[in-house]
Amino acid sequence: MPLIPMVIEQTSRGERAFDIYSRLLKDRIVFIGSAIDDETANLLIAQLLFLESEDPDKDINFYINSPGGKVSAGMAIYDTMQYIKSDIATVCIGHAASMGAFLLAAGAKGKRFSLPNSRIMIHQPMGGAQGQASDIAIQAKEILRMKDILNQILAHHTGKPLEQIQVDTDRDFFMSGEEAKAYGIVDHVITDRSDLDKLEKPQEA
């Protein structure tokens, strides 16, 4: 298990210690830096719901550095992003692949960012099947169903024709930040915090 850094802050009552993720949460920042599984999804969903309950009219900044992961876990995060009232600004740092790229594209329109050296990759869902032939057929049918759903949602968020999404996701499709911008997965490629700061200022006015 990786070591989680602690942050010490001075308060009127003395020193207070936070783990780094709790401290980021105070600034309405959530971060995923691993593969997406059920545990990761549950933690992230809880954070999103908490931040919405704190202030539904204030943006949430969602930083993504993930190779992707379990489709059902990613879809649970996606549905929560669409469900809550708060706009979610997504930021790719490092790489966003598979479900990571899917969640990156699912941010609020105009508030989806990539750092300049990030890599983004989309592809079709993968799955292994074993057991009796009838069981394998059922699992294959479910994978095809999820593929269609994911492609339709990606087409919605990128503005690309569904036919193009189907072709591009048939194999691993890698993009730079600028290429992801042209594709419609992100809206801006940023090198510093100025774009995010400009985004936050109107809310404070």
UniProtKB/Swiss-Prot annotation:
It catalyses: Hydrolysis of proteins to small peptides in the presence of ATP and magnesium. alpha-casein is the usual test substrate. In the absence of ATP, only oligopeptides shorter than five residues are hydrolyzed (such as succinyl-Leu-Tyr-|-NHMec, and Leu-Tyr-Leu-|-Tyr-Trp, in which cleavage of the -Tyr-|-Leu- and -Tyr-|-Trp bonds also occurs). The active site is at 98 (nucleophile), 123. One of its GO terms (biological process) is protein quality control for misfolded or incompletely synthesized proteins. Its EC number is 3.4.21.92. It is found in: Cytoplasm. The keyword Protease applies. One of its GO terms (molecular function) is serine-type endopeptidase activity. Disulfide bonds: none annotated. InterPro entries: ClpP, ClpP/crotonase-like_dom_sf, ClpP/TepA, ClpP_His_AS, ClpP_Ser_AS. Keywords: Cytoplasm, Hydrolase, Protease, Serine protease. Belongs to the peptidase S14 family. Cleaves peptides in various proteins in a process that requires ATP hydrolysis. Has a chymotrypsin-like activity. Plays a major role in the degradation of misfolded proteins. This is ATP-dependent Clp protease proteolytic subunit.
